[in-house]
């Protein structure tokens, strides 16, 4: 960052020299970016620019310096989310769009049409850079030292007056710089440099390295920190899923769940979403890992199989393995969403009188839907269209699954940021500590119950018997369904993961 000597004065100096921008846009009609592009767009750009110059004219003097930036919002045809790129050569625009799309959503569709949704122009009235006087060197020495908290402990740091901070020499953090309107903290891992115009430049000297000092041994404070970090990752995945989904079920009813898992498919943390999703998702993740033991970076999988961790077929789970730079599987992120329809003998894919799974819709069994970062649209369409009762609106299924892929990609990015901050050993250790702590708390809760055996029986509407016996011994509990009737010839059977 760059900090001038007036930065503490209500940011007035920065506002006074900042550029003034005007933004205008016009609908582009959805033409293919590959061309030919409509000739009327040139006229549209010129008209938008003229409107911007007119709007800023009263702030422009005779020596005004103008800047104009033409941009377009691109999207894959049939989708809602558009990304801004610079106007230019069609091939360059598509390349920039796909790079942004891969970073934001985790995949690209190289064979799909990219359309121009919006024409945009930014008209800029550039501020005047002040001719600040050169400053004379001071003593170049700190006036004293003080103690402050940095990198998990108390450290001794030099305290400089701004006028005595060295010119042209980097000072490593931790350090404090005092001026008339504020205090600047140069943290560990950063360095400060004052130039001859009295600007103080603070830069990251350990970019890309893990800087947080933390041990792999469990610490109660860090346990809570990591618990909330992982939970926050799942919550932010949910925000992306809600924002990018198309269906009412996911976008408005919020019938979805997101979670973070270890490399074995064990649940580490989840957002406060749908309990039946979260309790069963680990089995779906493990089923994917067993079906694809050699998963590679850039792969994403989908499943809704009730025999492998699913619930009912409309609940579709998207699973993204997370690998390190050497291609070793380290974590997994997953999202499950209730799709409005996946086929079956009735709309909604929850028929009251179905007698087989295929009567409830399309079954997706650990299917790879992203390979090497490319979305496998045709493969997924064929799977949704398979069987006697295919999905009724596969376009909506695809849109929501793409939203789930994007949500997972957010989780991948946030886990990568956590690794940069703490390092792999610490992150993996605290995943295990969180799981151990959860097991310990559960055991304590069971230990508070009196030892003994408790039984209950009930029957479904069709007369099928359900029997359960719970036996508590110390800190352990056994739940036994012996005596329950076998699976029946209707749709009232519970998958093992949901039981």
Where are the regions a protein language model picked out?
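C-terminal, non-catalytic interaction/recognition modules in large multi-subunit enzymes and RNPs
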Residues: 3-499
